[in-house]
């Protein structure tokens, strides 16, 4: 099995459009609407780097900065994280229209990390 790599980043918060403008102005990132009505914006990967997303927090909370590690089986990695002292936050969740499955776990100190399988752009 290949070593899993960081494949995606996400910045969410109370004001998704304001965050999109901030990061667009700061880094000259082109943020494209995801097209699903969520207010989420997609950032294409630069020649050196990874793509990501910026938008509103789903629960209306303060948001977070998260990175996602691309893996072949999110459920297996959640189980492994739990054996190592982590905790599952969100079980594997499929987003069919994006061909993506994601999950979240917290490490032993509470840092939340995303897992992804599929079409991370």
Protein language model regions, located:
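N-terminal beta-strand motif that seeds the catalytic metal site of vicinal oxygen chelate
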Residues: 1-20, 47-49, 64-67, 116-121
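Vicinal oxygen chelate
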Residues: 2-7, 11, 32, 78-79, ...
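Catalytic core of tubulin tyrosine ligase-like
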Residues: 23
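Conserved short beta-strand elements that form part of the metal-binding/catalytic scaffold
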Residues: 29-63, 112-117
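Conserved hydrophobic/aromatic beta-strand scaffold that supports enzyme active sites
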Residues: 42, 68, 102-104
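Mid-chain, well-packed structural core segment of small domains
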Residues: 61-87
């Amino acid at each position: 099995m290949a070593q899993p790599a960081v494949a995606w980043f996400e910045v969410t918060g109370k004001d998704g459009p304001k965050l999109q403008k901030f990061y667009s102005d700061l880094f000259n990132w082109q943020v494209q609407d995801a097209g699903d009505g969520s207010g989420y914006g997609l950032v294409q990967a630069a020649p050196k780097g990874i793509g990501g997303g910026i938008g509103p927090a789903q629960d209306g909370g303060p948001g977070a900065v998260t990175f996602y590690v691309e893996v072949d089986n999110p459920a297996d990695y959640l189980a492994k994280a739990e054996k190592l002292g982590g905790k599952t936050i969100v079980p594997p969740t499929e987003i069919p229209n994006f061909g993506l499955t994601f999950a979240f776990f917290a490490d032993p100190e509470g840092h939340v990390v995303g897992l992804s399988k599929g079409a991370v752009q």
